[in-house]
A protein has these predicted regions:
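A general alpha-helix detector
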Residues: 42-47, 79-83, 122-126, 140, ...
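C-terminal accessory module of base-excision DNA glycosylases/AP lyases that mediates lesion recognition
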Residues: 1-31, 120-121, 135-207
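Alpha-helix N-cap and coil->helix boundary residues
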Residues: 35, 55, 59, 71, ...
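Alpha-helical ds-nucleic-acid-binding substructure associated with the helix-hairpin-helix region
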Residues: 20, 24, 52-53, 57-129, ...
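A positional/architectural concept
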Residues: 9, 15-69
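Structural motif
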Residues: 33-41, 88-91, 182-189
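Short alpha-helical scaffolding segments that buttress acidic/His motifs in well-ordered protein cores
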Residues: 43-48, 97-101, 141, 192-196
């Protein structure tokens, strides 16, 4: 797995910018956000992980990966809808996986060259044209495949929960309050989010 070049610098920046994060950074200093280096796998894992716990997602993915074998679009599409769904997916998620694989085949996406030298906004706009890939899934792709350093998935349930605990003393923060707090983390909001996830779940978030 690949470690971001900005990792150490970002932790130093965040420790100074936000004292509330400093304790988290020290507690989890040995943990690093990383990329699997596989675009398709990252997207499929993000779909599997939508709105379920890290542990539940790992269980479903294990069954799915075992059935697919090598993670290639043609291998996924060679399985029937029911075979995919039987791994623990909803009907919607099953269709979303198929949609992503069809996109990879239609655009002949075989390696990183399709994504390199592009802005995240360009990649984001492409991804959300795929039915089932919304803002959150595209943001996870940016964070965990492209290793973009300044992504803030504002609708992520885990991020909201962690911020309520740390900055709201358990009270529910408004969207504007969440945005205002996150401003101090720029240009390393992806890193701040990763440590917020660690604060509520001992399992690493990894797509």
């Amino acid at each position: 797995m690949t470690e971001p070049k900005y990792w150490q610098q970002s932790k130093e920046f965040l420790s100074k910018a936000d004292p509330s994060l400093e304790e988290l950074l020290l507690k989890h200093e040995d943990y690093i956000i990383s990329s699997r280096g596989e675009a398709l796998e990252t997207l499929l894992r993000a779909i599997v992980g939508q709105q379920i716990s890290v542990q539940a997602a790992a269980s479903v993915w294990g069954k799915l990966a075992n059935k697919i074998g090598q993670i290639k679009p043609e291998n996924v599409l060679s399985l029937s809808f029911d075979d995919l769904k039987a791994c623990g997916l909803s009907k919607q998620k099953t269709q979303y996986l198929i949609n992503i694989c069809n996109h990879f085949i239609s655009f002949s996406i075989k390696d990183h060259s399709h994504w390199e030298d592009r802005s995240f906004e360009s990649v984001y706009q492409e991804l959300i044209t795929i039915k089932g890939v919304g803002p959150w899934t595209a943001e996870m792709f940016g964070m965990f495949y492209l290793l973009e350093q300044d992504i803030f998935p504002i609708k992520d349930i885990g991020i909201i929960r962690a911020m309520n605990q740390i900055y709201g003393d358990g009270n529910i923060l408004s969207k504007n309050q969440i945005i205002e707090i996150s401003e101090q983390w720029k240009p390393y909001r992806s890193v701040a989010c990763w440590f917020l996830w660690k604060s509520i779940d001992s399992e690493d978030v990894q797509y």
